[in-house]
Amino acid sequence: MKMLLFLNEACIFIDSVCEGIVFWGLCLFVCAECGNAYYRGARVPYKTLFRAFEVSVFGQKEYPNFRFGPSYRFLCLSPYSICCKQPPMEEVILYYPSPDSLIKNRKRVLGVAYL
């Protein structure tokens, strides 16, 4: 499945309330099957995943290196459409972006999920 990759920010939506948490170093993917975008973390070291971006001497954002191995699964996690690439609900795990409050939650939230 072809994916387009963008580096961006996101908010967590829990119980229809935006917590306004910014995800640094995460990836925004666009599903080639249904065209919906969703946020997804890369399989990177723990400290890298939760590291804030660094600003270069030119004032540009520098993000961590993302390395995708053969075990990294590209799946559509958008709840806004029915897509053949969506995983079963029980496989979806949400990670909060704080090292102090890393929580696994087995329920789908609005567009923010990891496997």
From Swiss-Prot:
Protein family according to the UniProt entry: Belongs to the UPF0377 family.
Keyword Transmembrane helix: yes
GO CC field: membrane; peroxisome
Entry membrane topology: Single-pass membrane protein
Stretches that traverse the bilayer: 10-30
Keywords: Membrane, Transmembrane, Transmembrane helix
Protein name: Putative UPF0377 protein YHL045W
Coarse class of the protein's main subcellular location: membrane
Organism: Saccharomyces cerevisiae (strain ATCC 204508 / S288c) (Baker's yeast)
Cell location: Membrane
